[in-house]
Curated annotation (Swiss-Prot):
Swiss-Prot/TrEMBL GO biological process terms: prolyl-tRNA aminoacylation
Task performed by this protein: Catalyzes the attachment of proline to tRNA(Pro) in a two-step reaction: proline is first activated by ATP to form Pro-AMP and then transferred to the acceptor end of tRNA(Pro).
GO CC list: cytosol
Record-linked InterPro entries: aa-tRNA-synt_IIb (IPR002314), aa-tRNA-synth_II (IPR006195), aa-tRNA-synth_II/BPL/LPL (IPR045864), Anticodon-bd (IPR004154), Anticodon-bd_dom_sf (IPR036621), Pro-tRNA-ligase_IIa (IPR002316), Pro-tRNA-synth_IIa_bac-type (IPR004500), Pro-tRNA_synthetase (IPR050062)
EC number: 6.1.1.15
Organism: Ruegeria pomeroyi (strain ATCC 700808 / DSM 15171 / DSS-3)
Enzyme class at the top of the EC tree: ligase
Catalytic activity reported: tRNA(Pro) + L-proline + ATP = L-prolyl-tRNA(Pro) + AMP + diphosphate
Identification of the protein by name: Proline--tRNA ligase
Keywords, comma-separated and alphabetical: Aminoacyl-tRNA synthetase, ATP-binding, Cytoplasm, Ligase, Nucleotide-binding, Protein biosynthesis
PANTHER family: MITOCHONDRIAL RIBOSOME PROTEIN L39/PROLYL-TRNA LIGASE FAMILY MEMBER, PROLINE--TRNA LIGASE
GO MF annotations, alphabetized: ATP binding; proline-tRNA ligase activity
Family: Belongs to the class-II aminoacyl-tRNA synthetase family. ProS type 2 subfamily.
Length: 464
């Protein structure tokens, strides 16, 4: 993309309404614009990151054997009355009456709707286990929306629901989701710690929240410092293996890590003092096992092996996709702007032309742009007639991990400058070497990269 043709309304000054870093930088970088309190328009740069996160979530869900679908934002109030939860959400639920006088609501979650779908189409234990999920916009009427997309009223969320014949099968689904979520967050450059938590109005017997440590987090958390040393990395996990999923679950949850709602001071004090930590955390996901809490009152049963009807065991699993962007920025920024992890950056590399209009510099930038595009990367070429300082400031603000700087002086020596946004370190390379270096950096994140042929055309959702 050429910046002269892109819509990137960056702000030079810090917006007065922004209280935390992620909100301030998302507004300044032209990622979002507030439509009303807690509701945002996603501008091209922000939407591009949102789409990348969504695709990572889809890829990891499908890898775990989960099936994508899509449910509506508007739901019937009757389903919520049937489950007994219609009044539990209080004023956070946006209630609507249509022209026929039917009570409806803008869904804050989807347990009732998915249970209704299940009971209408699944009747035998032979159709289990089953895990369905979707990514959809939600609405919760927060009394004080703040912190930008971190605590908005409208947000994009992944909901997954498993249906199993037995508690043991449902707990395997719980562990499978935990593994899948950890891998998802690691691909996004985040360390999200699973912590024992409270189930809230969703209910259930077992639940873990995934929290990213950050000073601006809304939750107080208590943990053993050794928990931050654990990584899943490139380990291959068989999601059908009960033992493998349980082993990962135990590895990541055996050390003390809890939110303030479930914190046990006596147990915490048994940890060696030098390893005890308390901090703030941003919740980016949660998994639940709630047994037959919804299936029994709503009649979601299957015919068991003995021919008798039995209520299915269920679980619910959510990732706050739009909130993740705020969490990533809170965890990865400096005083100049955002520093995107390579797995989620909106563009893979920036190209800065120090002397727009110079024939040699223009040609070199065009060649770099074409070469990077041909191997499947997305460069952002700043071809505006702006001062070099302004171009560098824009690149630093929007946080692309790598920048190639092209100028007449370097080209006389046959080199361009490749700069890391994270470290600020620069190296002079030939244009061909710079392209190869960037391609090598992104190869682990993009196995489809080609050194010879352009990337094939892609659909809007790469998971389709």
């Amino acid at each position: 993309m050429r910046l002269s043709r892109y819509f990137l309304p960056v702000l030079k000054e810090n917006p007065a309404e922004a209280q935390i870093v992620s909100h301030r930088l998302m507004l300044r970088a032209g990622m979002i614009k507030q439509a009303q309190a807690g509701i945002y328009s996603w501008l091209p740069l922000g939407f591009k990151v949102l789409r990348k996160l969504e695709n990572i979530v889809h890829e990891e869900q499908i890898r775990a054997g989960h099936i994508p679908m899509l449910m509506p934002t508007l739901q019937s109030a009757d389903l919520w009355r049937e489950s007994g939860r219609y009044d539990d959400y209080g004023q956070e639920m946006l209630r609507i009456t249509d022209r026929h006088g039917r009570d409806m609501l803008f869904g804050p979650t989807n347990e009732e709707l998915i249970t209704d779908i299940f009971r209408g189409h699944v009747s035998s234990y032979k159709d289990l286990p089953l895990t369905l999920y979707h990514i959809q916009w939600k609405f919760r009427d927060e009394i004080r929306p703040r912190f930008g997309v971190m605590r908005g009223r409208e947000f994009l969320m992944k909901d997954g629901y498993n249906f199993d014949l037995t508690k043991e099968d449902a707990l395997h689904a719980y562990n499978r989701h935990l593994v899948s979520y950890i891998r998802t967050y690691e691909r996004m450059g985040l360390q999200a710690i699973p912590m024992r938590a409270d189930s809230g109005p969703i209910g259930g017997d077992d639940t873990h929240e995934f929290l990213v440590l950050a000073e601006t987090g809304e939750s107080e958390v208590f943990y053993d410092s050794k928990v931050t040393d654990i990584r899943l990395g490139e380990r291959e996990i068989d999601y059908d293996s009960v033992d493998q999923c349980r082993a990962v679950m135990e590895e990541f949850t055996s050390l003390y890590a809890r939110t303030d709602e479930t914190h046990d001071e006596a147990v915490f004090n048994q940890i060696p003092e030098e390893r005890r930590r308390s901090a703030r955390g941003i919740e980016v996901g949660q998994i639940f096992y709630f047994g037959t809490k919804y299936s029994e009152p709503m009649g979601a049963t299957v015919q068991g092996p003995d021919g008798k009807p039995v209520p299915v065991h269920m679980g619910s699993h959510g990732i706050g996709v739009s909130r993740l962007i705020g969490a990533i920025i809170e965890a990865s920024h400096d005083d100049k702007g955002i520093i995107w992890p390579e797995g989620v950056t909106p563009f893979h590399c920036g190209i800065v032309n120090l002397k727009q209009g110079d024939g040699e510099a223009d040609a070199a930038c065009d060649q770099l742009y074409a070469a990077l595009s041909a191997i499947g990367l997305e460069p952002l070429y700043d071809d505006r007639n702006e001062r070099a300082g302004g171009k560098f400031a824009t690149m630093d603000l929007i946080g692309l991990p790598w920048r190639i700087t092209v100028g007449p002086r370097g080209l006389k020596n046959g080199v361009v400058e490749l700069t890391s946004r994270k470290t600020g370190e620069s190296v002079e390379l030939s244009p061909e070497e710079a392209v190869k270096k960037v391609a090598d950096i992104y190869a682990p994140h993009h196995p489809h990269l080609s050194r010879e042929e352009p990337m094939a055309g892609r659909s809007f959702h790469t998971w389709l």
